[in-house]
């Protein structure tokens, strides 16, 4: 009851206009160059252009080892749909294995096959580019202190469609999985019961309910609290505000029922995306969300400001689904300091900004009331 009362009052919270500290966002610290090294193989060369050592977190960047969205692929001016995974990573207690260290002016190379995360069977001419933000720590540290934005060159490739079609998709469905997913879509079932046990089903249903209430309350706060909206989304532009409100309302609707909707939700891994530190992931090409084992180690709803929990992880993942809101959100940055340092155009399209905004609004009221 206290939770419901707190969430219901969120929209009425009014904060004074204040300035908020930013984590340093450096737009010239890292250079990324793309080159073709095969029919669909791309090599990214990442160079530290600064004068100090960088410890770079690989999650959701051009260096991520998982089949995440590393590049944008266009043909005839239209973006080729991404078929890989969009994960939310556990960001607490980071260890060195998830970082790449670069000395000043040094470079590291990372190669990947774009045919594993895009259908390129049509063949022909394609344009590939990359943009994003790399969280960075100081040498010998895993504490994120800054973020380096990057924009790559445009890479033009002539791709053989037959060869591309022979490349196995990273998130490949088995015939059994395809059958389960098809039946779920026909029944418009949100949670696939066969993927859950009693405990994970209860936790997922609870997270959906909390996600709905958080999104509804955050939508009200976005329309009534200009200072907080500016803090999290770096703008008070009316059009941007309407996009954020509409997306939060869509997330609230999608979270409101476990028996219908536009997405399919799995309590356990189905396609092999639960890699180390992955809490949950989305396949935007299928409007499918999967909880990973460590998701259930999170609290249902945290009382810590900007901490991760089950409710905001579910909210985060729903923003990645095109059926919930189009265009769906990307993963440009993680964590409060990094997210509020994004330019407005990226902040309103970044999944974690929505999760953090919903959490921050709830936490602000929680500390006042309780």
From Swiss-Prot:
Positions bound to Zn(2+): 316, 320, 331
Reactions performed catalytically: Preferential cleavage of bonds with hydrophobic residues in P1'. Also 3-Asn-|-Gln-4 and 8-Gly-|-Ser-9 bonds in insulin B chain
GO biological process, one term: proteolysis
Keywords assigned: Cleavage on pair of basic residues, Disulfide bond, Hydrolase, Metal-binding, Metalloprotease, Protease, Secreted, Signal, Virulence, Zinc, Zymogen
Cofactor note as given: Binds 1 zinc ion per subunit.
Active-site residues, as the UniProt record annotates them: 317
InterPro entries: Fungal_M35_metalloproteases, MetalloPept_cat_dom_sf, Peptidase_M35
Residues in the signal sequence: 1-19
Annotated Gene Ontology cellular component terms: extracellular region
One Pfam family named in its UniProt record: Peptidase_M35
Disulfide bridges in this chain: 196-267, 274-292
UniProt-listed Enzyme Commission number(s): 3.4.24.39
A GO MF label: metalloendopeptidase activity
Coiled-coil parts of chain: none
Alphabetical list of PROSITE patterns matching this protein: ZINC_PROTEASE (PS00142)
Top-level taxon: Eukaryota
Names of the cofactor(s): Zn(2+)
Subcellular location: Secreted
Family listed: Belongs to the peptidase M35 family.
Known role: Probable secreted metalloprotease that shows high activities on basic nuclear substrates such as histone and protamine. May be involved in virulence.
Record protein name field: Probable neutral protease 2 homolog TRV_02539
Organism: Trichophyton verrucosum (strain HKI 0517)
Organism classification: Eukaryota, Fungi, Dikarya, Ascomycota, Pezizomycotina
């Amino acid at each position: 009851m206290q939770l419901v009362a707190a969430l219901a009052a969120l929209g009425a919270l009014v904060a004074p206009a204040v300035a908020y500290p930013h984590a340093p966002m450096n737009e010239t610290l890292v250079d990324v160059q793309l080159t073709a090294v095969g029919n669909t193989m791309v090599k990214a060369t990442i160079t530290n252009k600064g004068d100090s050592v960088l410890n770079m977190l690989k999650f959701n960047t051009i260096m991520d080892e998982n089949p995440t969205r590393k590049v944008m692929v266009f043909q005839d001016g239209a973006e080729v749909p991404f078929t890989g995974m969009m994960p939310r990573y556990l960001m607490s207690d980071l260890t060195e294995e998830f970082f790449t260290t670069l000395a000043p002016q040094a470079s590291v190379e990372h190669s990947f096959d774009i045919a594993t995360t895009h259908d390129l069977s049509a063949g022909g001419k394609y344009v590939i580019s990359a943009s994003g933000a790399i969280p960075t720590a100081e040498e010998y540290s895993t504490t994120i202190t800054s973020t380096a934005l990057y924009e790559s060159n445009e890479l033009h490739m002539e791709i053989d469609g037959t060869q591309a079609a022979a490349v196995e998709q990273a998130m490949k469905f088995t015939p059994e999985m395809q059958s389960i997913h098809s039946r779920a879509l026909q029944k418009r079932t949100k949670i696939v019961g066969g993927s859950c046990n009693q405990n994970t089903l209860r936790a997922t249903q609870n997270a959906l309910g909390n996600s709905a209430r958080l999104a509804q309350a955050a939508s009200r706060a976005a329309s009534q609290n200009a200072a907080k909206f500016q803090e999290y989304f770096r703008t008070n532009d009316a059009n941007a505000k309407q996009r954020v409100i509409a997306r939060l309302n869509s997330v609230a609707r999608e979270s409101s029922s476990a028996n219908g909707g536009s997405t399919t939700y799995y309590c356990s891994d189905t396609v092999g995306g639960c890699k180390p530190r992955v809490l949950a992931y989305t396949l935007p090409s299928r409007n499918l969300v999967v909880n990973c084992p460590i998701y259930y180690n999170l609290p249902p709803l945290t009382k810590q400001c900007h901490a991760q929990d089950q409710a905001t992880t579910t909210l985060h993942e729903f923003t990645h689904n095109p059926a919930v809101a189009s265009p769906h959100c990307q993963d440009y940055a993680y964590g409060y300091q990094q997210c509020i340092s994004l330019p407005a155009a990226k902040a309103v399209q970044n999944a974690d900004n929505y999760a953090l905004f919903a959490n921050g609004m709830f936490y602000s009221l929680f500390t006042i009331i309780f």
